[in-house]
Each structure stands twice: as structure tokens, then as C-alpha cells.
Amino acid sequence: MNNAQRTMTATYNAAMASPPDICIRGAGIVGRTLALLLARERLRVALVDTPPQTTGPDVRAYSLNGTAQRLLQDLRCWPDSPAVTPVHQMQVFGDHGGILTFGAQDQGTSELNWMVDVPVLEARLAAAVQFQPQIEVVPSPVAAPLTVICEGRASQTRAELGVGFDITAYEQHAIATRLRCERPHGGVARQWFTWGQVPGRSEAQAEILALLPLGGEGGHEVALVWSVHPLRVPHLMGLSAEDFASELGQACHMALGHMTLSAERAVWPLQLARASRWIGDMPGTTKQAFALAGDAAHAMHPLAGQGLNVGLADVAELVRVIQAKEFWRPLHDSKLLRRYERARQADVQAMGLVTDGLQRLFAQPGPVWQNLRNWGMWGFDRSGPLKNWMTRQAMGQDAAA
């Protein structure tokens, strides 16, 4: 056995009472959720948890739909307010007068989705894992019939297994932070498709700016995700907190009044990516298999706010496939795992195409494209059944419901 194979098939950790059925590599939100779901099926789980690489402030907040909320509530891991903020309405502004409004009341409900503080959610999941006797948290990989890789888009295990990761880089980086606003957000998520001047470029470049409500009902705090051209990043990151808030206020037309930064700024490149395959045999054996889930399998533009929803849908589908397996079929069976791969690849590809198409549509310069997309927004906002169908899809509801 060579070194790579030895790494892939790490020996059983004697600290565990009995050999695990499944090893999960990655103890983020997706990995811990999967571990808790599998433990309820009376499966023995080894959860590989390694210290995070960064120690800076965590400004992440995720938009979660109804399906994800019900999943986490069922695990008793749904955070309390103000760590969870219901979104009652979403407003999307085009670059030349177009506007879309999505309202929860139009769907006969009180929330479109929820904004959730990542550190609080991670803490709830970690606490639940500690109280689950079927889960053993381990510092290094453990050999098991099935290994599920939930290490994120930079997964080292995926690379070691030789699984391709097809990446299309956008000419955009995301700048994220949190702000205190003069006016309350009112439970409204706001997004602008706009343009920003880039150093060294004669033409302005497409940008997407989102202000997402935080701090519970009636809160004055928002999460910012500002997708800008990479050449504009040094300028925006180099501004003082006051000057950054001022430039941001101009870009969003002072929608929430005066704003002040309440956290450090973070930045990362945006990309569309997907793994060439989601399942396979571990090296050197046909008795152990792997499956990818979450960002280890895919990445998409954040403009639709579906990243974590898609990752949680991965783990829910994998658990469903395991629940429905024939009693004689082992967890590493390729036909079993192919059911999971087929189900998730199609949905993820569809969502990726939608977000990629929207990003590219609003990145096209010129008055013809500008008029086309803004008239399209106007028409879609009045489309009735089509708009309702799209809204229910984003909410994680059955379109026929």
C-alpha cells in the first residue's frame, strides 16, 4: 500500500467503541447535519473535525429556505432569535428601473426564508453532536465502508482521490461584512444589479449588491455581500470604515439611511464549479467507497442565496437513499450510491445554470441588453403563475403545493 492509499484508508481509531459505518470528513454545517441524521438511523459515525485555518471574525450569514429550516428544527438545532431573522419580502432592483418584489404573503405564508448567523448555528450543531452516542468526533480519518467528503470547495481529500473539479471563475470577488443601519430593515432582503468603475477600465463593470436582514424582527443590522470586479477590490478594502460605508450608501441609494460597519470586511473569489463525479471506490479496495456533499461537490454564485440550501439538500438525499436501501446491500455499493449521484447532480446543475445565467445576463454591457433585462424584470414581476412557481422553488416548497 502506497502513502496515498494509506492516507485514504486510515486505520480504525481505537478510541471508538466499535468500527464506524460511515466516516464524514469535514465538521462544518453540512458535515454535522449529516452526522446527526445518520445517527438517528442507528449508524455509527466517525466525524473528522480539524481546527479551522483562520481565526478572524466570522461575518457569515446564510439564507435558509423552508426545507432547510424544517430539517434543522427536526434535529432541534434551529437557533433562536436574534440569531435567526425571518425574511418577509425580497426586493431586486435592476440597473435601469427594473424591479422585482417577492412577498411571503403572496404565497400564503409569513416568511420567504430566514437569515441565520453561522457561528450560532455551528454551535448548536456541535452541541447536538456531543450528546449523540452514535457519533465519535475524531481528529483524523477512519476507515469505514462509506466516507462522505464535506470539506468544502477546497477539499484536499477530493484532490487526493483524483476527482476533477471543473471551475469557471467569475470576474467578481465577494466582499462581505456587517453594518448597523439608521433605519430598521423591516425583514426585507434587498439586492441591486448595478455598475462600478474599475481602475484601468474605461467601461464600468457589473456588480451585485445585497443587504440581508439580521438581528431578528425589527433589527437594524444587515449582512452585506457585494460582488465586484477583482480590480476594484483593493480600492474598496483599502477604504476606511467610514469611507467604505459612504461609498456603499451611494451604491444602494441610502435605502436604510446612514450605515456604519460593525465587523471586519472579508473577501473571496466567486466561481461556478462542480465535481466530475460524486461517488467512487476508495483507493486500493472495493469494500470502501466515497461520496461528495456540499461545497466539496459544487459551488455557485451567491446571488440567489442557495449555497447552503443545496448542500443540506445533498445530505437529506443521501440519508433518504440509505434509508431506502435493500437490507442486503452494503453502504459502499456503487448502485446504491449512484442513486444519490443521479438525484443530486441534476438538481445542482439546474440551480447552477440559473445563477450563472442571471449573473451573465446582468453583466452584459450596452443599452440593448440593459433595456432587455429591465423589461424582462418588469414582465416577470407581473407574470403571476411563473413568478409564484419560481418563488416556491426558492422557498423549498413543492411547486404544485
Q: Residue locations for each model-derived region?
A:
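Active-site flanking residues adjacent to catalytic metal/cofactor-binding acidic residues
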Residues: R25, V48, C150, G294-D295, ...
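Conserved FAD-binding catalytic core of PHBH/FMO-like flavoproteins
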Residues: L72, P145-V267, R274
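C-terminal helical "tail/cap" subdomain of flavin- and related membrane-associated enzymes
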Residues: R320-A401
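FAD/FMN-dependent oxidoreductases across multiple families
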Residues: R232-H332
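Glycine-rich FAD cofactor-binding loop and adjacent beta-loop-alpha segment at the N-terminus
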Residues: Y12, P19-C23, A27-H88
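Conserved N-terminal helical subregion
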Residues: Y12, A17-S18, R70, D74, ...
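Hydrophobic "anchor" residues on beta-strands that sit immediately upstream
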Residues: I22, V45, P145-T147, A291
